[in-house]
């Protein structure tokens, strides 16, 4: 038997995970020549972005065991968020427009990339592409207006890499590519 000895016990900080939202088509966003999508960092304005994987379980009891077993059967991820209503930020404007225009259904779906800045190869970082419905729970007045809500995942997340230099997400070969609500909506437009 061999033991792994870790000599570097660094802990990821909130600045080690970055979130980039697709803001293609948002008013005032200039598209980069040759790029399909335009992403912007959800940093300034965002005061909270908390992931809850929400593992769903199923309990099984066997007649020969006193203790039940719980198996993970699926996930229902969601992301609680708070951001200041900085209307000059395109990703904030995109979220605010959902509640302002009382959008429903596929019109509430946004795409964002979650990037692990501590997992880098060259200019690419390990990342997940997420399609999520935006549910705004409140617009609070605390001198500054604060948007509070939840992003609810729509389908499976797509694993891949995000090139910080080019702003391009590439799905990994082992991630099955399924059409999402957001992609269907974009194809209709």
Which residue ranges define each predicted feature?
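Basic/polar N-terminal segments that are highly enriched at the extreme N-terminus
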Residues: 1-5, 186-189
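Solvent-exposed edge beta-strands and adjacent loop segments
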Residues: 2-80, 132-145
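Compositionally biased, intrinsically disordered low-complexity regions
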Residues: 27-30, 36, 45, 107, ...
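Short beta-strand and beta-hairpin "edge-sheet" elements
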Residues: 44, 113-159
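Extracellular/virion structural assembly segments
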Residues: 63-129, 159-164
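Short, low-complexity, polar/charged sequence segments that are solvent-exposed and flexible
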Residues: 98-104, 131-135, 153, 168-173
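Intrinsically disordered, low-complexity terminal/linker regions enriched in Pro/Ser/Gly
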Residues: 161-189
């Amino acid at each position: 038997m061999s033991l792994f000895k870790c000599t570097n016990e660094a802990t990821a900080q909130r600045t080690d995970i970055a979130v980039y939202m697709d803001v293609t088509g948002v008013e005032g966003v200039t598209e980069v020549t040759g790029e399909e999508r335009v992403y912007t960092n959800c940093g300034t304005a965002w005061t909270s972005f908390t992931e809850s994987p929400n593992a769903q379980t199923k309990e099984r009891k066997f007649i020969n065991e006193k203790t039940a077993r719980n198996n993970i059967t699926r996930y229902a991820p969601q992301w609680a968020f708070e951001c200041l209503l900085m209307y000059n930020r395109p990703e904030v404007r995109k979220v605010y427009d959902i509640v302002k225009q009382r959008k429903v259904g596929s019109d509430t779906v946004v795409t964002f990339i979650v990037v692990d800045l501590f997992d880098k190869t060259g200019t690419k970082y390990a990342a997940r592409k997420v399609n999520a419905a935006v549910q705004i729970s409140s617009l609070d007045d605390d001198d500054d207006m604060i948007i509070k809500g939840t992003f609810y995942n729509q389908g499976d997340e797509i694993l891949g890499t995000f090139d910080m230099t080019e702003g391009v997400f590439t799905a990994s070969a082992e991630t099955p590519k399924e059409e999402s609500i957001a992609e269907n909506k974009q194809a209709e437009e």
